[in-house]
């Protein structure tokens, strides 16, 4: 009887596990409305893996959460061949809705989409630098906002997480204790509806002069409009040692004046004698 009881309990547990798995199984539905492809994922995984074909034109991809901060990303989705995948975060919730503009209904990408909670970043490129810093995947350029705090060197950099060409400018992020060995972190500041997050600098506000908190890390960066490429200076602040940033609600803090163009790349530093912050911004002016 004891043996039969154990078998019965085991069978019940297996059925419960099966029911739980079934209840939370992922389901992806794709539909087309005009020039928009709508992908709905029930019980979404962490990522939707997007197949990339570098030679093709960019489509626009959006995670639609209904927020004013939802941002279209430019992605070279696979048309008739695939070079590699990039992860597209689906966020949390029972359903994730992804919208795509500029993708043909018969594009190969729609047959190659994958759902996954992980993304393999194993370095398989023989010629990839092992000493010089490179991101786990994607495109990088200028180092930005380099700062030292609490035993860590912070390296932020121009970063496109959706391909190996320029675009979708974010601030990527890595930290190191010795400037040689780097820990890769999630992008710190993402492209937003205003535009791309261009280069800038960071400071540790030891005296809380800005009011964001003592020892907050404050990033000062150029926001480049996705529409007309106007450039303005914005700030964001972090109270968790640079892992995440909150964009200042009063952005922009500085706009072009006196006919200035190419108004970007702010460098900020504290002038102790004057007890104030100074900002140096590169600019061009036609005369």
Regions found by a protein language model. Name each.
Residues 1-27:
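Bacterial Sec-dependent N-terminal signal peptides
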């Amino acid at each position: 009887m004891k043996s039969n009881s154990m078998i019965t309990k085991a069978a019940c547990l297996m059925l419960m596990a099966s029911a739980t798995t079934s209840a939370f199984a992922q389901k992806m539905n794709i539909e087309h409305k005009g020039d928009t492809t709508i992908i709905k994922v029930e019980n979404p995984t962490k990522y939707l893996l997007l197949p990339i074909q570098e030679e093709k034109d960019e489509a626009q991809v959006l995670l639609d959460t209904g927020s004013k901060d939802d941002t279209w990303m430019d992605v070279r989705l696979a048309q008739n061949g695939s070079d590699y995948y990039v992860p597209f975060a689906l966020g949390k919730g029972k359903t994730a809705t992804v919208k795509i503009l500029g993708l043909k209904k018969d594009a190969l990408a729609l047959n190659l989409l994958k759902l996954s909670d992980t993304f393999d970043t194993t370095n398989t490129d023989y010629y990839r630098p092992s000493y010089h810093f490179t991101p786990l995947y994607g495109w990088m350029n200028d180092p930005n906002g380099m700062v030292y705090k609490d035993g860590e060197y912070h390296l932020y950099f121009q970063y496109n997480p959706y391909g190996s060409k320029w675009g979708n400018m974010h601030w990527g992020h890595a930290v190191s204790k010795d400037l040689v060995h780097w820990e890769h972190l999630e992008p710190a500041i993402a492209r937003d509806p205003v535009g791309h997050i261009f280069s800038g600098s960071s400071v540790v506000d030891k005296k809380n002069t800005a009011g964001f908190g003592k020892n907050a890390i404050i990033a000062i960066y150029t926001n480049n409009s996705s529409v007309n490429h106007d450039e303005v200076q914005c700030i964001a602040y972090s109270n968790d040692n640079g892992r995440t940033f909150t964009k200042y609600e009063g952005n922009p803090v500085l706009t072009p004046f006196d006919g200035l163009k190419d108004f970007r790349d702010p460098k900020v530093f504290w002038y102790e004698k004057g007890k104030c912050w100074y900002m140096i911004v590169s600019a061009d002016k036609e005369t």
